[in-house]
């Protein structure tokens, strides 16, 4: 992370490592800093930095660490994923729509049916829009000004045939898509 810490999580435990002057790592647990929260099978499986806070995600809770304190919240609808595009923090609920975070609450932005009942695997910046990679739609969708449209690429047929697992954007604006059974693909902003 930007602060030089290595954030980690596991079953009902999360925190960070810092480098010591002796070239070792020292662990600092954050679990006991969560006030008024009862852990219940919370396994941390995703960690992201959002608007200056570190967010630890379990299958039923989110933990927000601002550098001084930790707040834990149970979510009614379980988040499938978390991703940030610009200053906006998104999550898709399991079997639900795509939501935007407003404070500590998720507000539905796009209903699941717009994605063909598919999972949104990633959200990436694309000029003034959000480029979303979906599992069942065979590739990418663009969200701009309240509308969703297909982003056509030269790999659409491949993405329909093979299970897509992940996508990232490189520093030079190349979209890299990983599949489970057919390797990785790199696309430019024109979908080539």
Segments from the language model and where they lie:
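Carboxylate-rich, polar loop motifs that coordinate divalent cations or form catalytic acidic clusters
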Residues: 1-192
């Amino acid at each position: 992370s930007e602060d030089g810490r290595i954030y980690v999580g596991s079953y009902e435990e999360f925190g960070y490592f810092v480098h010591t002057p002796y070239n070792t790592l020292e662990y600092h647990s954050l679990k006991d800093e969560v006030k008024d929260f009862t852990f219940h099978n919370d396994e941390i499986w995703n960690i992201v930095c959002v608007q200056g806070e570190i967010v630890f995600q379990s299958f039923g809770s989110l933990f927000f660490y601002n550098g001084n304190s930790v707040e834990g919240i149970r979510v009614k609808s379980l988040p499938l994923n978390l991703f940030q595009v610009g200053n906006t923090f998104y999550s898709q609920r399991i079997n639900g729509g795509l939501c935007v975070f407003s404070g500590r609450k998720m507000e539905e932005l796009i209903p699941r049916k717009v994605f063909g009942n598919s999972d949104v695997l990633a959200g990436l910046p694309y000029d003034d829009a959000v480029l979303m990679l979906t599992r069942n739609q065979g590739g990418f969708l663009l969200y701009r000004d309240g509308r969703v449209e297909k982003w056509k690429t030269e790999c659409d047929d491949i993405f329909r045939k093979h299970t897509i697992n992940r996508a990232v954007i490189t520093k030079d604006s190349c979209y890299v898509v990983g599949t489970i059974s057919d390797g990785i693909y790199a696309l430019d902003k024109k979908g080539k």
